UniProtKB/Swiss-Prot annotation:
Localization annotation: Secreted
Subunit structure, as described in the record: Monomer and oligomer. Forms aggregates in aqueous environments.
Family designation: Belongs to the frog skin active peptide (FSAP) family. Dermaseptin subfamily.
Biological function: Potent antimicrobial peptide with activity against bacteria and protozoa. Also has activity against fungi. Probably acts by disturbing membrane functions with its amphipathic structure. Binds to healthy erythrocytes (this binding is receptor independent), but has very weak hemolytic activity. Does not bind to P.falciparum infected erythrocytes, but accumulates within the parasite. Kills the parasite, but has no hemolytic activity on the host cell.
Tissues in which the UniProt entry reports expression: Expressed by the skin glands.
Cellular component GO terms, alphabetical: extracellular region
InterPro entries: Dermaseptin_dom
Organism phylogeny: Eukaryota, Metazoa, Chordata, Craniata, Vertebrata
Keywords: Amphibian defense peptide, Antibiotic, Antimicrobial, Fungicide, Secreted
Protein name as it appears in the record: Dermaseptin-S3
Pfam families named in the record: DD_K
Organism whose genome encodes this protein: Phyllomedusa sauvagei
UniProt GO BP: defense response to bacterium; defense response to fungus; killing of cells of another organism
Length: 30
């Protein structure tokens, strides 16, 4: 079950990074 928690953590970090990238792109366009 420990690897599942690790995957969840990685998923959260990846999600935050993706959101940050999208916000940067939107901010650069506007």
């Amino acid at each position: 079950a420990l690897w599942k928690n690790m995957l969840k953590g990685i998923g959260k970090l990846a999600g935050k990074a993706a959101l940050g990238a999208v916000k940067k792109l939107v901010g650069a366009e506007s």
